[in-house]
Amino acid sequence: MSLLTRPAAPLAAPRTPTAVRGKLVPLALIVLVCMAAYALFIPRIMAALDPLTGDEPFYVMTALSLAHDGDLDETNNYAQGDYRAFYPPDPLPANWQGWPAFPRELPPHAAHSVRPGLYSKHGLGVAILILVPYLLGGRLVTILFLNLVAALVAANIVLLARRYGHGWLGAVALGVPLVFADPLMSYAYLIFPEIFAALAIIYAYRRGREARNTAPQWLGVGLALAILPWLHARFIPAVLGLVAILIAGWLRESSWRRRLAALLPPLCSAVALPTYYLAIYGKPFPSTEDHAGFNTPPEIVNAAFGLFLDEQWGLLIHAPIYLLTAVGFGVLWRTRRGDLLAILAVALPYLALVAFYRVWWGEWGPAARYLAPLAPLAIAPLAAWAGQVRRAVAVVTVGLLALPGLAIMAGFLAAPQLMYNQPDGFNALFTSWAASRGEVWPKFFPSFQPYAPSPILVRQLWSLWLALLAALLCGLGLLLPPRGDRAKESTAARSIGEP
């Protein structure tokens, strides 16, 4: 099956109200349970991560400018100190649990604009998405909204796992180590583009791999494609990959209603976004001056491995469950090659751009920030692998690899400030755990970021180890004896009946 080819549409079972309810009820339950689990920790997050830090306050300032002034010029908003609305009192209360130090005057993240005034360099999409929740109830309602988006990501993860023949319980069990670990759970509380992008990418990918879509489903795909570039320009390569895997199915649609539902949102976005850039930058694309610089070819390779192995920000250090994607890739190559090529079409261009960034780790934020939007797609190879091995093997392997990630996330929830690291090479959580036992963290894992890098030989050896391990696991997936393609259960009846 080629990259642009989707499965042919088999005969669909009747879409009865009972069948639809049978799918919507478990999905609603998944969303509610995830939201409840996330919401349990909101008080701790809000108390410890106060005031807003990283990029978060700048999205709020843009939202306040839109709400109060109806414009994007934030000159008066900073002059008036609008940020004091989400800052703690001065002096701090005696029971203060938030950040021990922060600037009392928020320095703006200004774009290099050709227009007079002060415009944020951050994408406009997040500010627009949080505008209504923030006006309704400030940070609390905004976090609840983020929790809802994260819960919808969880529901899509489960639906994608079911594509590979798993029942509801099996799909949920496979999704838990992704949903309740870094990076997805960390960014479920933070005003960043990541969790919005994660939902848009997995939904568009999932619908793109189904044989048929209804008009509302095509509209959802179109909205996902339209929103992503407004969250951040770095998502444009992922959008192009999604278009590549969606175009064949769109061209096969016989209904112009369904075609228009998918086409109109991204078409409007494709016109509006360059117009916005022209107004801000005087050119139809964002300014490279708004970034902290870019890597040379050797630095790109270093960043590519650092995204996974860096002690402070590496994905595999914080959630080793993602190692199983390598063996899953081997399984997909043998059983669902089109799915694998579709994942690579979305992921590789995006990863190449992120590795090109000098600050590839996302600076002041939890681990694996730039990998969070792609993290939900890991359920596809994970579920494909789990469908090819004995259940006991899947349970034990997933359990063992999930435990470190769940434990690290528990540590972050107990002390949320430890999600953030100074670029000194030492993981704040690991250092804290060692100190609680009266020990010094021995720094077992390498550092790839340029401010405190490990010796180049150490980084090269770890990179070689990861490359060999990934190749070995992928080869193992290729050699696994087939157990029958349980994924064939994914019929048109399922694809139409599920959102």
Residue map of PLM features:
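Membrane-interface alpha helices of multi-pass inner-membrane proteins
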Residues: 63, 174-179, 207, 217-232, ...
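Specific aromatic-rich, kink-prone transmembrane helix
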Residues: 156-159, 196-213, 220-225, 241-245, ...
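Transmembrane-helix motifs of polytopic, lipid-linked glycan transferases
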Residues: 141-165, 198-203
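Interfacial juxtamembrane loops and adjacent helix segments
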Residues: 68-126, 130-134, 290-296, 358
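Loop-to-helix entry region of an early transmembrane alpha helix in multi-pass inner-membrane enzymes
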Residues: 113-131, 135-155, 172, 186-191, ...
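Membrane-lumen/periplasm interface segments of specific transmembrane helices
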Residues: 229, 258-328, 343-357, 375, ...
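Start-transfer (signal-anchor) and selected internal transmembrane alpha helices
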Residues: 1-44, 162, 258-265, 395-400, ...
